Structure formats: C-alpha cells, structure tokens
C-alpha cells in the first residue's frame, strides 16, 4: 500500500543524527573488569588483567576533544541530534551532559555501562535498564524514552523496556522507516526506530576501513536514494557517530561536508529520535493498525 510522505512541512526525508557517548563506560581493568575494552582502533588484543593504556587514551580523546568538536559542528548548523549515552559516561563528564540538554539535543539510553546484556538474567537486565534511566535523568535533567543496546540483547529486553516506561527501541536494522512491534509480551505496542550500520562512522575504524572521503560519498549516495524514494513513501536515514571516531579532525571534515549538503537541500527534516517518535505516533497511532 502506498503511503504518502508524512514528515513535517512536506519533507521527503527524516534524518536522525545519532551520537554515541560510550567513552568512560567501556570495559576497563582500572574499573575492576577482568579485561580491557576489546573495541580498539589499533586492533590490539591484550591478555586478561592487563591494562591497555593506549586504548584508554583513545577513548579519553572522545570526551576531551571529540565531544566539543562534534557539538560545535552541530551548533554552527543549528542541528539537533540524539545522544545515545552509556549513563556512566555522562556521570564522569557532567559538562557534556549539561551541554546536551542546553543545546536542545535528546539523550537516549545506551546502557548504564557500555556492555552487552545478552548474558544477563531478567532481574539483572531490569536493574541495568532502570539504573541507566535514573542516572541519565539525574545528569541531564530528562528521563530517556529510547534505548539502544551494545550489540546483543535478550528475549526479555523489549518487554522490560516497556515495563520501565521506554517508548522506542533502536535495536533493529530491518527497515528505512519506523514501525510498530504489536506482538510484544505485554500486549503494549513498542515503536521501533531502526538504526543503520552501513552509514555509521565505525566504517572508518573496522578493516577494511573507509577513508573519510569514502564515508562521505557513501552518505551522499544513501541520501540520494532515500530522498528520491521519499517522494512516494516515508523514509528515515540514520547517521551514527562516535566521539572518538567522527570527532577526529579529518573525519570531522567529512562530517561537516555532508551536513552542509543536508542543510542546503530542501525537504530534509533533521530531527531527534524523540521528535520522530512523537510525530510517527500521532500520524500512525498503533490503535489504527
């Protein structure tokens, strides 16, 4: 069934800029974990119990230099984003937490720490989800309404999110537009706002890695296709960023180039995920399904 474009002001495409804030919440021997964080730009794997000081400093760069650079880029273009934050990161970087709120961005929960939850029992996962929301509300002044896991989650996750008052879930890669999960255990529909790996700046970290120019070209091609399709059906594009990745100068230049193209193109609605959630819920309420 053809669905006419439905974004505000007749926009053909909704662009969701997502900024992951994970630095300071990653695995760390210094924080009592058995091993150092495995996600490392240099690809170094160290034995359990050994600190990876180099990787720790790379994550610290995200907080010290990457965060202000990315936030300045957004501010100069009057753009808002969804900051998917591991709560502990914001506890350790209160200035960033305050600026997220002051600049009009949204904070989405990305766990309490940046850790997988697939191996948690139900009680532990519930506490993990609840603690993240409580902490983010304390540091930013606003309780998160969305959730993004670190890769793996459980069969209980979506039900627990509903029970804890979350209103959208990002752990899905199956579409280019929002949709309702009406088959939840609670019987209460959950709005799914799909994310995307292919446009994520992690593509400049993982081998074989994109150059910043490769990444910008891919973003532009993605925008072209979704923008054209958006004349007929609703389309949403996700742009995933990390403080320690896109926050580096050469990569930030590619980001700026793409965002300048976005700002110069009519018919693109740059919105937080909470804004997309509210708009979709009003336009396509689950009661009409």
Would you name each region that the model predicts?
Residues 1-191, 216-239, 245-289:
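Catalytic alpha-helical scaffold of carbohydrate-active enzymes acting on polysaccharides/glycoconjugates
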Residues 177-178, 192-214:
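Positively charged, amphipathic and often flexible ligand-engagement surfaces
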């Amino acid at each position: 069934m053809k669905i006419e474009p439905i974004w505000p002001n007749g926009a053909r495409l909704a662009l969701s800029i997502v900024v992951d804030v994970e630095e300071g919440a990653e695995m760390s021997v210094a924080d009592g974990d058995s091993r150092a964080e495995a996600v490392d730009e240099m690809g170094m794997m160290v034995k359990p119990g050994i600190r990876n000081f180099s990787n720790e400093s790379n994550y610290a760069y995200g907080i010290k230099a990457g965060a202000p650079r990315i936030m300045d880029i957004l501010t100069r273009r009057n753009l808002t984003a969804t900051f998917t934050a591991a709560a502990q990161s914001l506890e350790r970087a209160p200035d960033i937490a305050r600026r997220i709120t002051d600049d009009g961005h949204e904070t989405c929960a990305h766990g309490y720490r940046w850790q997988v939850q697939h191996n948690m029992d139900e009680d532990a996962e519930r506490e993990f989800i609840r603690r993240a929301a409580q902490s983010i509300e304390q540091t930013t002044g606003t309780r998160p309404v969305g959730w993004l896991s670190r890769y793996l989650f459980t069969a209980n996750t979506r039900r627990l999110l509903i029970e804890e008052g979350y209103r959208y879930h990002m752990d899905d890669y199956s579409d280019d537009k929002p949709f309702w999960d009406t088959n939840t255990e609670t019987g209460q529909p959950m709005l799914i706002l799909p994310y995307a790996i292919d446009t994520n700046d992690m593509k400049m970290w993982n081998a074989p890695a994109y150059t910043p120019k490769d990444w910008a070209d891919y973003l532009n091609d993605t925008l072209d296709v979704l923008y054209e399709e958006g004349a007929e059906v609703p389309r949403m594009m996700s742009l995933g960023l990390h403080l320690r990745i896109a926050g580096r100068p050469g990569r930030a230049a590619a980001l700026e180039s793409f965002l300048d193209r976005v700002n110069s193109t009519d018919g693109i609605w740059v919105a937080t995920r909470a804004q997309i959630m509210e708009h979709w819920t009003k336009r396509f309420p689950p009661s009409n399904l």
